[in-house]
Amino acid sequence: MTSRRSQEKSYAEAAAAPPPKEAASSDVTPAVPADVIYKLLGFTAAMVVGPIGMYFITVNSGASSTVAGITAAITANLVLFGYIYVAWLDDREEREAASKKKEKKAQ
């Protein structure tokens, strides 16, 4: 007959086991602020609608398709540079706020 092992943990097993995890805090704030998402969606729409719209406006005004393509490419680049500029301004504002916070903490 085989012997049964008790269901309780031995002292060595209990000491080696990791401590029970505490409940995680219920922080439900989004990782990315909503205004950043709205800006991204706006520039995405501008990147889709702007160049295509400029292409068809240019073609319908009597210009060649080559000129219309160049106009669409320029429009896409303007939207891209606009997004980069807005992102740079947001980042600069965040860095200034963080430096002010550090200054205030140091005092």
UniProtKB/Swiss-Prot annotation:
Name of the molecule in the record: Vacuolar ATPase assembly integral membrane protein vma21
Gene Ontology BP, a term: vacuolar proton-transporting V-type ATPase complex assembly
Lumenal topological intervals: 61-68
Top-level taxonomic group: Eukaryota
Name of the gene: vma21
Higher taxonomy: Eukaryota, Fungi, Dikarya, Ascomycota, Pezizomycotina
Biased composition (Basic and acidic residues): 1-11
Family assignment from sequence similarity: Belongs to the VMA21 family.
Cytoplasmic side: 1-39, 90-107
Originating organism: Neosartorya fischeri (strain ATCC 1020 / DSM 3700 / CBS 544.65 / FGSC A1164 / JCM 1740 / NRRL 181 / WB 181) (Aspergillus fischerianus)
Keywords, comma-separated and alphabetical: Cytoplasmic vesicle, Endoplasmic reticulum, Membrane, Transmembrane, Transmembrane helix
GO CC annotation, single: ER to Golgi transport vesicle membrane
Transmembrane stretches, start-end: 40-60, 69-89
Biased amino acid composition, Low complexity: 12-26
Residue positions of motif Prevents secretion from ER: 104-107
Membrane topology term: Multi-pass membrane protein
Free-text function comment from the UniProt entry: Required for the assembly of the V0 complex of the vacuolar ATPase (V-ATPase) in the endoplasmic reticulum.
Disordered, as annotated region: 1-28
Subcellular localization, as worded in the UniProt entry: Endoplasmic reticulum membrane; Endoplasmic reticulum-Golgi intermediate compartment membrane; Cytoplasmic vesicle, COPII-coated vesicle membrane
